[in-house]
Amino acid sequence: MDAVILDIGQSIAAAIRDNPPGATFILNSGVHREGLLWPKDGQTFIGAPGAVLSGARVLEGWQREGAVWRRPGLPRPHPPGYGLLTAGRESGRHLEELFIDGVRLTRVDAQSDLGPGRWYFDANDGAALIAQDPTGRSVELSVLGVAFSGPARNLTIQDLTVEKFATPAQIGAIHGHEGIGWRILDCIVRWNHGQGINVGPGALVSGGAVIENGQLGIGGGGANGARIEGVDVARNNAAGYDPYWEAGGIKISASAAVIIARNHVHHNAGPGIWGDIDMIGTLYEANRVEENDLNGIMHEISQDAVIRCNVLVRNGRVGRDWLLPSQVLIQNSRNVQVERNYVEVGAGSGNGIVLIQEERGSGARGPRETRDNLVRGNIVVHRDAGGWNGFGTVADASAADLWPNRWEANIYYVPDEGPVHWMFGGVPRHWDELQGRKAFGGTVVQGERRLVGTTPAVKPPC
């Protein structure tokens, strides 16, 4: 059948209802203000150039009251969302966002805190208040909770901008958690309160950008076989969620055979890429991960991963606290290969390639222990006298000597020969102490050290 053309104002939900599985819909240029869409199996949604699917409504009818402008009569707000927020960002529990000319304002909890770039919701009469003149400007309030959701199989969303949905934390504006085989191709997903995209089993997110979402760029759990490839994932966690809880660029959990490759993951307020809780058979390959607040790539309480041919630069912008954050962090995980990556530790920011063991109980494959890992053929550059590489333990320092983790053929560039850039078993070590160190008959540390003046080009040795 021919594609169904949808102009502005036509109901997308009605078109889904009135057409069979496998139908194709083309959303014409302009802003389609609709959401809560449950497609049928195999349906395809393609955006014409300039097509936007928005969860926001336009606010007109502002009334000036002294130094502020009030817009009464707003719909009942969503219940406050869940999730941990950082201190001072508690207003992020509210799901609605207000935008002026496409710029997100910060919500405050008291009218007295109003000022440029801020807005307040007065629950007494359901009014939004701002401290800047809205005359001649586009003011929008996000009201709809999700764009696409449901159990459809083999859905395709392509060339579409999806923005300004009032999603809670851990829910994507494109929420494919219950679906199978969703394909999200060359889409821009931005300015949503929770996650931009949540993937399910067999999903493919390819191309496009997932930017400036409130909690997380791309998330998912139970997303076996999902692929995230060639996506710009940037400046997420705009609402101020606690990144140690869950916030930042990409986080996938409890999934097998996930591939995260060739993405540019940068300037997120949290980790760049995070695999957590029984991630098995994960491939992190050829990503450029830079200037995220916490760890660059983190594989936590999981097994069987390959981290190769990535560029990781100046992650850990919040500073350093022991071995956290790091460019690459292997936390209570086993059988991980960290190979042929370019790693750069910025001045005052983060660490290099780090393994950590602490008591984390058992998972799908037994005790969660940091063992049987290989760190080989990486280039690690330190821009100052700080930052660590190696193996840190909490409570049981003997694990560093007893468990078979190996470091082979890595090259470390350091500012001078004096600083100590290694930790082993929770104890700082000088380079000379580590050469040829043995465990279970294998060489634990083997490589070379060069001065930073001979730093190579910023590319992985692949």
Residue ranges of model-derived segments:
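Generic serine detector
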Residues: 11, 29, 54, 91, ...
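Extracellular polysaccharide-degrading/modifying enzymes targeting complex plant/algal/animal polysaccharides
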Residues: 5-177, 183, 418-419, 428-462
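Acidic, glycine-rich calcium-binding repeat modules characteristic of RTX/beta-roll
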Residues: 33-40, 205-210, 397-398
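N-terminal low-complexity, Pro/Thr/Ser-rich intrinsically disordered segments
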Residues: 1-3
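Charged, alpha-helical scaffolding/interaction elements associated with membrane systems
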Residues: 18-21, 211, 290
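Intrinsically disordered, low-complexity terminal/linker regions enriched in Pro/Ser/Gly
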Residues: 181-182, 191, 212
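Glycine- and acidic/polar-rich repeat regions and solenoidal domains
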Residues: 36, 163, 167-177, 194-200, ...
